[in-house]
């Protein structure tokens, strides 16, 4: 139905995919069987005394955001896309970030991959998710839905509006908006 494409177009229009200014958008392909954020970020290996990356782009983005939040209060927006988010129960693998929705946290959310280091995501981070409702996916709980904005797409969206989507993709490649302008 074009859910992922729309998220990518949105990120492009906001200037978050512009590699010249620094990419501020990461797509996470959710896998069946995830039970913790350590399944897609990484974890601390106490035997080797190192951090093991589960997904290099996610780990590096969250590490960069944590570093930025320690060094500055003027942090540009960042968007993570959870593609096919309900292939695993969101309440399990997304719990530290879902918890942040329960209370307004001006300074973001702090979590640990193990070890002694605490990681911090600033409040300028946003999460998008695409979901399907069929026999291959997990149902979404009321707890999750109460904290989410849901946009439902018509299954025939791409067939009926393909030309408009192509125009939007061309527009997105022009970087009509730059997140850097938010801080000027």
What are these regions (language model features)?
Residues 1-177:
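AAA+ P-loop NTPase catalytic core and its hallmark functional loops
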Residues 183-184:
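Basic, amphipathic alpha-helical bundle interface domains used for macromolecular binding and assembly
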């Amino acid at each position: 139905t074009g859910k992922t494409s729309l998220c990518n177009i949105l990120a492009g229009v906001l200037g978050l995919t512009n590699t010249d200014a620094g990419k501020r958008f990461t797509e996470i392909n959710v896998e069946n069987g995830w039970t913790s954020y350590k399944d897609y970020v990484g974890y601390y290996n106490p035997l080797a005394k190192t951090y093991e990356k589960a997904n290099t782009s996610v780990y590096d983005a969250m590490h960069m955001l944590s570093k930025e939040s320690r060094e500055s209060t003027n942090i540009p927006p960042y968007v993570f896309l959870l593609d096919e988010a309900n292939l695993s129960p969101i309440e399990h693998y997304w719990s530290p970030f879902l918890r942040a929705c329960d209370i307004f946290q001006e300074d973001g959310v702090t979590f640990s991959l193990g070890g002694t280091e605490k990681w911090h995501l600033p409040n300028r981070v946003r999460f998008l998710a695409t979901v399907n409702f069929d026999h291959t996916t997990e149902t979404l709980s009321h707890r999750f839905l109460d904290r989410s904005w849901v946009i439902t797409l018509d299954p025939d969206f791409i067939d009926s509006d393909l030309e408009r989507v192509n125009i939007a993709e061309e527009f997105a490649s022009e970087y009509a908006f730059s997140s850097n302008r938010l801080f000027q």
